[in-house]
From Swiss-Prot:
Ranges where the KH domain occurs: 209-272
Residue stretches spanning the membrane: 3-23
Membrane topology: Single-pass membrane protein
Name this polypeptide is given: Ribonuclease Y
Domain HD positions: 335-428
Xref: SUPFAM superfamilies: Eukaryotic type KH-domain (KH-domain type I), HD-domain/PDEase-like
Any GO molecular function: RNA binding
Length: 519
């Protein structure tokens, strides 16, 4: 390469650098000018926006000030109106006080005038009394002088004469008053009883000793009986109820005098029929479950009864005992219905006489509570009822009402008399009771009572309408020979103490169970 060529290359390079510099400078100046213009435009826009915001803020401030001014003026007007009203009320009160003061002044003037008049009259009366006393003394002296009798002697003569004349009239008036009082008392008593009876509408209850369980088909009867009768025998043994399986289509009859046992057997048999699995172990399970259900139902009946009658605050155990009356009858009359009826009647009569109706209802509801206890507890239902009421701290009037409603004790309150009257009314109404059914049930209860009075007896059941009594004994207390002796002793005692038609079969059952579990 020649020096000329190198020189030319250097010159061209320098020329290119100079041209590039001027081009970049021109471009940079153009960009700076554009940026300056944009900045000026942005600044101008910002100024315009700031001015607009300023104007808008001023307008809003003016509106706010105007609104506040209007609200303040409105509040001032309201306060002025309220002050004006208060001022008017104060003026009205001042006027009323002025009028009252004027009235008080007038009354004070009238009272002063009357007081002055009364003082004058009092003075005049005292003067007249003095004159009358003086005249009486003068007349007495004159009479004593004329009759030659002293004042006391004359007074005694007059009193004796008046006493003789009035004694006969007093006796007649006393007799007439007594007769009128008796007539009025009888009339009022009849009126109170009629009102109470009209206001208390009760059902005529007639309890039976059988229950019917419907079956889905007649094939179920064979399953209930079981192989060699083991199912029906287990159910009868556990419940003490007779199962009558006859030609009645799709039905089994449960017969027994104890309604609680009968209801337990009915529920258990219903569950077994619905479940379909009928065997001794399942029967025992269902009977136990049914007993718990009956216990729950008894408690619910007690609570429902206290709610319907309006008696509150009873002890929970007493409520459960009250519910047992649902399954008790007296001469065919349901005892719970009878107790409710007595409570209503006693409460109505107490209201008519102005006595405590709530306490009368309480006493009426609990008057037969002793009938809920089984015959295992000795004593009459009155004695048991008094013991229960005392145990659960009932009111003394309630305890006396229970003790006196059959005349065993003297009633100490009107409520006790009303409870006895209500008890008689409820029992005496037509159709309320049946003597035959009650005697039959008592005979069955006596059968069980005699059987369970012997040592070693676990439980007993009177079945077959009282023609058989089955006695379950404890196998560890009585052996086979003693079981025969026990049957003879019970048979002899039944013959000595009971009157009954036909024959009574005494069956003593001694059962030993051995249970093991394979693991």
């Amino acid at each position: 390469m020649t020096p000329m060529t190198v020189l030319i290359s250097i010159l061209l390079t320098l020329l290119g650098l100079v041209v590039g510099y001027y081009v970049r400078k021109t471009i940079a100046e153009a960009k700076i000018a554009g940026a300056r213009g944009a900045a000026e435009q942005i600044l101008e826009d910002a100024k315009r926006d700031a001015e607009a915001l300023k104007k808008e803020a001023l307008l809003e401030a003016k509106d706010e000030i105007h609104t506040l001014r209007i609200d303040a003026e409105q509040e001032v007007r309201e306060r002025r109106n309220e002050l004006q009203k208060q001022e008017n009320r104060l003026l009205q009160k001042e006027e009323n006080l002025d009028r009252k003061h004027e009235g008080i002044d007038k009354r004070e003037a009238m009272l002063e005038k009357k007081d002055h008049s009364l003082n004058e009259r009092q003075q005049h009366i005292e003067e007249m009394e003095s004159k009358v006393d003086e005249m009486i003394r003068m007349q007495q002296s004159e009479l004593e002088r004329i009759s030659s009798l002293t004042r006391d002697e004359a007074k005694q003569i007059i009193l004796d004469r008046v006493e003789n004349e009035l004694s006969h009239d007093i006796a007649i008036m006393t007799k007439e008053t007594e007769n009128r009082a008796k007539e009025e008392a009888d009339k009022k008593a009849k009126n109170i009883l009629s009102l109470a009876l009209q206001r208390c509408a009760a059902d005529h209850v007639a309890e039976t000793t059988v229950s019917v369980v419907n079956l889905p088909n007649d094939e179920m009867k064979g399953r209930i009986i079981g192989r060699e009768g083991r199912n029906i025998r287990t159910l009868e043994t556990l419940t003490g109820i007779d199962l009558i399986i006859d030609d009645t289509p799709e039905a089994v009859i449960l017969s027994g005098f104890d309604p609680i046992r009968r209801e337990t057997a009915r529920i258990a048999l219903d569950k077994l029929v619905q479940d379909g699995r009928i065997h001794p172990a399942r029967i025992e399970e269902m009977v136990e479950k049914s007993r718990r259900e009956v216990d729950d139902y008894i408690r619910e009946m007690g609570e429902q009864t206290t709610f319907e009658v309006g008696v509150h605050g009873l002890h929970p155990d007493l409520i459960k005992i009250l519910g047992r009356l649902k399954f008790r009858t007296s001469y065919g009359q349901n005892v719970l219905k009878h107790s409710m009826e007595v409570a209503f009647l006693a409460g109505l009569m107490a209201s008519e006489l102005g006595e405590d109706a709530k306490l009368a209802k309480r006493a009426g509801l609990l008057h037969d509570i002793g009938k809920a206890i089984d015959h295992e507890v000795e004593g009459s239902h009155v004695e048991i009822g008094v013991e229960l009421a005392t145990k659960y701290k009932e009111h003394p009037v309630v305890i006396n009402s229970i003790a006196s409603h059959h005349g065993d004790e003297e009633p100490t309150s009107i409520i006790a008399v009303l409870v006895a009257a209500a008890d008689a009314l409820s029992a005496a109404r037509p159709g309320a009771r049946s003597e035959t059914l009650e005697n039959y049930i008592r005979r069955l209860e006596k059968l069980e009572e005699i059987s369970e009075s012997y040592e070693g007896v676990e439980k007993s059941f009177a079945i077959q309408a009282g023609r058989e009594v089955r006695i379950m004994v404890k196998p560890d207390s009585i052996n086979d020979l003693e079981a025969h002796r026990l049957a003879r002793d019970i048979r002899k005692r039944i013959e000595d103490e009971l009157d009954y038609p036909g024959h009574i079969k005494v069956t003593v059952i001694r059962e030993t169970r051995a249970v093991e579990y394979a693991k």
